[in-house]
Structures are given as C-alpha cells and as structure tokens.
Amino acid sequence: MLENTAIIIAITTGFVAFIGGYFLRKLLGEMKITSAEERARLVLEEAAKEAESKKREAVVEAKEEILKLRNEVERESRERRSELQRQERRLVQKEESLDRKLEALEKKEENLAKRETELAKMHEELKALHQKELQELERISGLSTEEARQILLQDVEKEIQQEAALLVKEIEGRAKEEADRRARNIISLAIQRCAADHVAESTVAVIPLPNEEMKGRIIGREGRNIRAFETLTGVDLIIDDTPEAVIVSGFDPIRRETARMALEKLISDGRIHPARIEEMVEKARKDMEVQIRDTGEQAAFDANVHGLHPDLIKLLGRLKYRTSYGQNVLKHSVEVAYLAGLMAAELRADEKLARRAGLLHDVGKAVDHEVEGPHVTIGVDLAKKYGESPEVLHAIAAHHGDEEPETVEAVLIQAADAISAARPGARRETLEAYVKRLTKLEDIANSFPGVEKAFAIQAGREIRIMVKPDKVDDLGAVRLVRDIARKIENELEYPGQIKVVIIRETRVVEYAK
C-alpha cells in the first residue's frame, strides 16, 4: 500500500514537474521572441535613421556637385566669350591692316603703270637714238653692223684666249711646283728611312797562316802546288814577305771567295798536294753554291719579298759577288727594293710589287758575263722564265729607259735605282773599268772554239787559257794562242803587254783493283 502510494506520488510529482517545465520553457521562449523582436525593431529603427542620414548626405553632395558643374560651365563660358571677343578684335585689326595694304598696293600699281609707260617711252627714244648712232657709225667707219660685231668678237676671243693661256700656264706652274714639292718630300722621307751599308770592294783577300813554314808547303816542290791551285781556281796566289799571310788576288769575286775557302781548308787540313788541292777546290765550289743560296734567301728576307723561284734566289746570291762601278749589286738591289717600297707606300701604290721589282731589277747582271746581251734584256728573260708577273717584267724592262714606263711602280723603280746609284760614295768608275777590261779579256779567249776555261791574272797582264785536249792538238794550240793575241790587240785597249798562255793537259786515270 505504501509502495503504491509512493509510486503515485512519484508519478504525480513527475507529471507536475513535466507540466511545470513545459510552461516554463514556453514562457522562456516567448520571452526570447519578445526580446528578439525588440532587437529587430531597434535594428530597423537604426537602419532607417542611418538610411535617412545617408540620403540627406547624398542630396547634399549632389547639390554641391551640381553647383560645382554650374560654376565650371559658367567659367568656361566666360573664357570662351573672352576668347571670341579677342579673336573678333584681331580679325577687325587684320581687316583694317589688309585694307591699308590693299590701298598701298593699288597706289604702287598705279605708280608702276605710270613708270612702265615712262620706261616704254624712254626705250623707244633710246632705240631710235641707238639706230641713229649705228647709222652714223656705219657711215663713218664704212663697216656694217655684222662686220663690226665679227671684229669685236674676234678681239674678245683673242683676249680671252690669251687670258686662258696665262691661266693654264699659271695652273700648270703651280701643279708642277706642288708635284715637285711632294716628290721631294716623298724621296726625302724614303732616303731618311733607308740606312744603307757601304761596301768597299777589293780584288784581294788576305789569308792568315799559322806559321811561315806553311808558305813553303803551299808553294810545293818546284812550285807544283801553287801552279795547281792557280790553275784550278783562276786566281793569283801571292806569297811575299808579308809575315804569316798570303794574298789571293782575282777580279772575279766568286773565284776569289772560292779560292779563299779552299786555301783555308787546305791550311786547316795540313795536307797540301795537287790531288788534295783539286778535292778541296771542288768542295769549296759546293760550299760556295750553298753560301750563294743562303745569301739570296737573306736578301729576299731583308727586302720583304716572298715566293721567289729557287733559281732566282741563287741568282740573287750571285749578285753579292758582282759590282757595278764599285757598288755591290746585291746591296744596291735590296736598297732599291726598300726605297721603291717606301715611296710606293707614300703614294698608295702596290708596295709588294714595287719591292719585288726593285729586288729583281738587276738580276740579269748575275749572268751577263755568261749570256750575250744587255743585263736588262737578260733580266726580263730570266724573270719571265721563272714565272714573274707582267708588271714585274715591265718594271725590269723600263728601269733603264729601254721601255716607256706605263705603271707607277715602274717609275718608282727608275727613281729608286737612280737614288741608290747617285748616293755619294756608292760607285767608283776606276774599279768598274778595271773589272770590265779583265772580263773583256776573258770573253775574247772564251769566244774561240776548243777553249774550256780562261782566267785573267796578274791584274790583266796575263791570261791563262785551258783548252780541251780532244779538240785542240799541239799545233792547234800554237795557232790558237796567236789568234787570241791578235784579237786582243785589235779589240782591247791596255797599257804595256799581255802574256797569253795556253795550257793543254791530257789526264788519264785508271784504278788498280
């Protein structure tokens, strides 16, 4: 019973609590709704107030903008009116100025028309007066107008021709003076930049000896060594009282140098006899060929000329042992190449061509004693043979005036050749004449058939002639020596007498095996 009562009480209490809670919750909800509505109302009121405020601000701003635009429009309108007024005033002023100018122009036209009428009247009067004067002049002079005009034109033409001739002469004189001045300047610059060596040529070479005993060994038994040496080399070997020295004398520098080299080798070797002399002379000739080639290559290098044919190099080397009036021809050729190159550079011509032609211009002198003809013709033939250009050939051919120079380089070679030859101390007449006489003496002997070699010795007082034994017998040698002596008497001028010696040698060699 009590338990049921407790259950009922609990149920009743729970129900009451539930009902109470429900109403409490509902009451709280209504209170929240009321509070939210109040807040919403406040928000709406605030928004309405803010919107009203912004609306008023927008209206104020719009009014201000309208006022600003109105002021701007009014200002621009005032400025435009002012500008229009200024332009209107300028137009009025221009119109007034144009009116004044038009009025002045009309006055000038009236004056010009009046002046033109006066000038026309004066022209007619002058024409009539001129015609009257012409008639009077024709009556007095007896010439028609056309005849007088022709005479006047002829006089004027003569006067103008004289003035033109004087003007041309003056211009030519100034041009020539300027050309001479520039030429002197170019040549002086070239000469100042060219430092040429002077070589004093000699016909002897002095060879030192280790002792006086060596002189006897050089002479040999009954002079066989010295005779063999002189016969093989074609020079004079002078052994005198000069202490510890012998002298090699010969006008041909190549022979003299070959003999010097051979004798120095013999002295160094110590074995001196005819067979050894022949061997050393042959070796010296080969060494001489090498030295000639090296000399030619050095000359081409000094002249800055490249691409020469090897045979031309050898011919250049031979020029070292050739003189022209005492001037070394190789030194002269290098000097001409250098001068021609400098002048060509100043004139903006072909410097390489000028140097090449200058180096080769006297190459014919290397063989002119072996080949007939002037050295210019020989040089042209040699250069053509070894593939030189037509410009180089022309410069060589024209350097002595045998051809008219047609290029600037050819003229420069002529000038450089003359400058080098005319330099004080460059050439001597005496030595050249002496060498020419000895060369002529040898040429006379070599012109006869059967002659193998001919050597002029003893300063031209003796000539030794080697003949071919298979072509000239003993009787033929007697006839030949007389013919050579007679031809020397007829063709050569010389002091005193010349000894002509013919040597006929038959050499038989056999080897024992």
UniProtKB/Swiss-Prot annotation:
EC number: 3.1.-.-
GO BP annotations, alphabetical order: mRNA catabolic process
Pfam families linked: HD, KH_1, RNase_Y_N
Enzyme superclass (EC): hydrolase
UniProt xrefs under InterPro entries: HD/PDEase_dom, HD_domain, HDIG_dom, KH_dom, KH_dom_type_1, KH_dom_type_1_sf, Ribonuclease_Y, RNase_Y_N
The KH domain, residue ranges: 203-266
Membrane topology listed for this record: Single-pass membrane protein
Superkingdom, taxonomy of origin: Bacteria
PROSITE patterns xrefs: HD (PS51831), KH_TYPE_1 (PS50084)
Localization, UniProt: Cell membrane
Keywords for the protein's UniProt record, in alphabetical order: Cell membrane, Endonuclease, Hydrolase, Membrane, Nuclease, RNA-binding, Transmembrane, Transmembrane helix
Chain segments annotated as transmembrane: 4-24
Coarse class of the protein's main subcellular location: membrane
Domain HD: 329-422
Single annotated GO MF: RNA binding
Gene Ontology terms: cellular component: plasma membrane
Intrachain disulfide bonds: none
NCBIfam families recorded: HDIG, RNase_Y
Function: Endoribonuclease that initiates mRNA decay.
Alphabetized HAMAP family for the sequence: RNase_Y
Stated family: Belongs to the RNase Y family.
Protein name: Ribonuclease Y
Gene that this sequence comes from: rny
